[in-house]
Amino acid sequence: MNNIELLIQNGNTVYFPVVKEGITWELKMQGMPGKLNFTVIKDGILNFQEGNAVRMKVNGQNVFYGFVFSKKRDKGNEIKVTAYDQLRYFKNRDTYRYTNKTASEVIQMLAADFNLQTGTIEDTGYKIASRKEDNQTLFNIVQTALDLTVQNTKKMYVLYDDFGKLTLKN
């Protein structure tokens, strides 16, 4: 049986809520954020809101770090919560023009602009001469840069969230 530890942080207060059975954790490799669904029991102490950090460990291993995006309270004392990792912010649309950047540098640029945390971002090496991305999701901007890298180097890279840090690996 797995030992699951889930906590929610609201400011400086950390809660270890009573979680009902049925936590679901979804990971997809391309173009989608990690998603955590769970139901907590509302008591007189638990106080959290959208945007608060959520962390989950399984058997002592860090597996999910994200943020509450929605919560729905039923007629009783149960609150259904959906949290996403920071790749959720890659669904934002924006316009970018860049010159002579690697896919790694594009990811670091987007992370800096959106205040996202990065971990290991491997150097993809291939410099993209010039690109204009008009009203594209950040996922599409990154995927285009990675596709151009694969076409020119035959090396494939994967972007994922490693417990709260954007990570790019070959």
Question: Which residues does each PLM region occupy?
Answer:
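Short intrinsically disordered coil segments
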Residues: N52-M56, Y96-K101
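Alpha-helix C-terminal capping segments
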Residues: K57-V58, A111, T118, L159
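Short beta-strand-centered interaction patches in the first periplasmic/extracellular domains
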Residues: E78-I79, D85-Q86, T120-N170
